[in-house]
Amino acid sequence: SSDLFEGEGISIGMSGGTIRILMAKAKEVRQMVVYGYARLIGYDSKLILRADILKKFNVEKGRIFTLTLREGHRWSNGDRFTTEDFRYWWEDMANNKELFPAGPPVQMLVDGALPTVEIISETEIRFAWEHPNPEFIPALAKASPLYIYAPSAYLKKFHPKYQEADKLAQMVAAENRQNWASLHNRKDNSYKNDNPDLPTLQPWVIQTAPPAERYIFSRNPFYHRVDTNGFQLPYIDEVHMDIVAGKLIPAKAGSGEVDLQGRYLNFNDTPFLKQNEEKYGFVTHLWRTGKGSQLTLYPNLNIEDREWRDLFRDVKFRRALSLATNREEINEVVYFGLGLPQNNSLLPGSPIYDQKSAYAYAEFDIENANALLDEIGLKLGPGGIRLLPDGRKAEIIIETAGESTEETDVLQLIHDSWLRAGIKVYTKPLQREVLRNRVFSGQTQMAIWSGLQNGLASPEMSPAELAPTSQQQLQWPMWGQYLETKGAAGQAVDLSAAELQLERYFAWRVAASFEAKKKIWSDMVRTYNDQVFTIGLISGALQPIVANARLRNLPAEGYYNWDPGAHFGSYRPDTFWLSLSKTDG
């Protein structure tokens, strides 16, 4: 079906050809599932959820989901794709303790309860929960999706319910597996994508068994989508993925050894890439990254030190630090003026984007920053450094994972601008796991990390990042842990603004209408920015995308984002095609 692409300006292409890409690890064959982005329901380039593999879907009261398959759809090996593949996954896999020891995936649970699953026909299935399940549809559309179906005709031969015991035992021994469940799990991993025998619904099918230096993917002869002329996609016949050292990928991309590459390229590779375009016949597009902020400061609101905890929980202090941050300078010096000097918030590509909110307390205003610090009562001491109420100097150690010179350069600029507000900054590089554990235990004052994972949110997506819902949130890890463990660990939220965010998150989970969800999202984003729970430094940093100059339907401008977006996935590589020259098509 071509319905997903109407109005997206995709040109009719020509079939054939090979695309070359590079990866650094053999396990990255899974990126072809990301890029291929065939999903039951998927995001289009405008981040609207639409039926893809499914013919259609219907949602009632936010809790009853009816999925309709396409008549005659087949797996890549020619087996029929029907609701039997859903039934098999649900009854014989997800609810089999040997295959799923912890039970079905968490996205299938609402308040601890599983859905009622009804097979209506070979092409229609219904999942019904007692209460709304807002995570279900977005989970199906993720870059790494929730799989609620499996190729049953292929997998039944590895399941004791359908296979003779002696024959199954022979296969377990031949594959050197511990038991039938281990064998079944090895054969079935649609996302891992390392079994050439496993049928798929993706546009390209892996042909090469690991280990290998080159993996070949060929077009799926039963792929479901066609262009507006009725021609079956994908246009490209084969994708060749070579495995090379990651540090060599920029050089290889810049010497014409790839036809499409984003992974392992960094913004600082851009000048080298640009200067080689004409010689090697490629173009370098600059897409925006999709995180809320390229780099973000996380004041630890759960720090053990009471004086610092009180300060970090004072919104005036957080606002003062944000106002003392010279984002324009950071943008010019580190990002050549090409970033967006806003806070850690949604991006212009999000349908919920609010420019005024995104730039709240993001302007450089050292006078107001100092006024707020004076108002709090932090008096200037010797050397122009402010003093805490207990007499200690206002010195903040910002801990980093020490993984990039980008962080070092940015933190030096912050050191200089915060000093003008009487705040002294020190930088402490740590190993990633050490940093996380120090944050979790309340030792870290402030950490630097990337911002919101999803800066391109739409109302259907979970706003969990904006509320204390996970220990991984570096500004309030103990509050997040408390929710995750149902109070068994961590600390209960005791800051009113954070409590309000949590209440709104729970309200979003049971909201039945799109408009209600959009209103909650807008309120949560506004509060998140106004309260400056995190201090975003720069957004919309640029990601170089190298493409063969003959490659068509790849947009010159786009967002390079994991989820939503699946990197290239939402721009539909199955529609990419190679023209005969650089100028035609």
Placement of each model-derived feature along the sequence:
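Extracellular/periplasmic solute-recognition and catalytic clefts
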Residues: M93, K97-P101, V117-E118, V205-I216, ...
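Aromatic- and charge-enriched surface segment that lines or borders ligand/interaction sites
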Residues: K55-F100, R126, F136, K252, ...
